[in-house]
A protein has these predicted regions:
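ATP-binding N-terminal substructure of ATP-dependent carboxylate-amine bond-forming enzymes
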Residues: 1-124, 128-130, 134, 141, ...
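Active-site nucleotide/adenylate-binding loops and adjacent lid/helix of ATP-dependent enzymes
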Residues: 2-11, 15-16, 23, 84-87, ...
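ATP-dependent carboxylate activation and anion-phosphoryl transfer catalytic cores
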Residues: 2-5, 11-14, 141-143, 264-355
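Hydrophobic beta-strand scaffold residues
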Residues: 38, 117-118, 146, 171, ...
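Conserved hydrophobic "DFG−1" position in protein kinase catalytic cores
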Residues: 80, 222, 292-294
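A glycine- and small-aliphatic-rich helix-loop capping segment at beta-alpha/alpha-beta transitions
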Residues: 109-118, 189, 194, 324-327
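Phosphate-binding site of ATP-dependent enzymes
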Residues: 188-273, 296, 300-302
Length: 355
């Protein structure tokens, strides 16, 4: 395990998942503070960075405006926006940013330009893991089973009915670039399709229409870099039609998390193997949660998606799956810091010259 470090935790962000990010960061900052010195950095809804008081707490507002220079020569320091003076010197950056401008490769690209160590996947893996259309194309290229789907761009809106005639009912209509089930609808009738398509296009210029499966929702937590490990599977038993935003985050939700999932040993092994294949297919690093669908009649496993920055509250599926394996929350966070440093050192060893 790494020695005590100064870790900048970025949270909030310019996305529909801003509040979820704040919740995750509250748990992450508290857990990291057991071993490390933590600098909470709020990314507000306009994209401004606000350095908050060091310690185990976070706030959804307030802080000193700061910025990071995208050059290795500046050594990853945080500077005051007001006068450019150095205010903090993080050793590692830990993005706990869900959705666009945080989980989609943009912030990871900034970290890579700045030459700083950071937790999680790099720019390309994050971008693929965020965009459901690109993600599904990558999965198909390595032979991973998926539900049938079609991708529509905003100018193809009128093709939605034709797509559903091919896929059959029910269908899921999803924004291509958003998580936490924001903007997703399950549609069973033709008269409800336009409303679902309009909602999805409010969040993205590209949407995915996917055939609905009668399936159990199985999740796998993956940890590692070049030799990733898979947790035992967990199962989501939602309290409504599907695992939507309210099922995930509402205090009134009665959604059940089964850890471990009640599966036969061959099913457990199959889920773990698929989880690792998915992680490696997008070239992920550090950690991810892989969501699978298991057909209730045949038991066949289908890949739903990979989440390269999964929810990280103390009751979220990712930490709970590793907790069931004996890796407690604080230890898990320190392991992620170690993996981020490991990836950084590997990348620093690569040549950047031609001759």
């Amino acid at each position: 395990m790494t020695s005590r470090k100064t870790i900048a935790v970025l949270f909030g962000g310019r996305s529909g998942e801003h509040e979820i990010s704040v919740r995750s960061a509250a748990s992450v900052v508290q857990g990291l503070s057991v071993v490390h010195d933590v600098l909470p950095v709020l990314v507000d809804r306009r994209g401004g960075w606000k350095l908050q008081q060091p310690g185990p707490g976070v706030s959804g507002e307030g802080g000193t405006p700061v910025f990071l220079v995208p050059s290795p020569s500046d050594r990853g320091v945080l500077r005051r926006l007001e006068d450019g003076s150095v205010i903090a010197r993080p050793d590692v950056y830990f993005p706990v940013l869900h959705g666009t401008f945080g989980e989609d490769g943009t912030i990871q690209g900034l970290f890579e330009l700045a030459g700083v160590p950071f937790v999680g996947s790099g720019c390309a893996a994050s971008a693929v893991g965020m965009d459901k259309a690109f993600m599904k194309g990558v999965f198909a290229s390595v032979g991973l089973a998926q539900a049938r789907y079609r991708v529509l761009l905003h100018y193809q809106r009128e093709q939605a009915r034709q797509v559903v005639e091919t896929l059959g009912w029910p269908v899921f209509v999803k924004p291509a670039n958003l998580g936490s089930s924001v903007g997703i609808s399950k549609v069973k009738r033709a008269e409800d399709l336009d409303e679902a398509v309009d909602l999805a296009f409010e969040y993205d210029r590209k949407i995915v229409i996917e055939a609905g499966l009668d399936a159990r929702e199985i999740e796998i937590a993956i940890l590692g870099n070049e030799e990733p490990e898979a947790s035992l599977p967990g199962e989501i038993v939602p309290d409504r039609e599907f695992y939507d935003y309210d099922s995930k985050y509402s205090a009134e939700s009665r959604t059940e998390l089964r850890i471990p999932a009640p599966l036969k040993e061959p099913e457990v092994r199959a889920a773990q193997e698929i989880g690792v294949r998915v992680f490696q297919a997008v070239d992920a690093s550090g950690y991810a949660r892989v969501d699978l669908l298991m057909d209730r009649q045949t038991g066949k496993m289908f890949v739903n998606e990979i989440n390269t920055i999964p929810g990280f509250t103390s009751i979220s599926m990712f930490p709970k799956l590793w907790g069931a394996a004996g890796l407690d929350y604080d230890e898990l966070l320190s392991r992620l810091v170690d993996l981020g440093l490991e990836r950084h050192h590997q990348r620093r060893g690569l040549r950047t010259d031609y001759r």
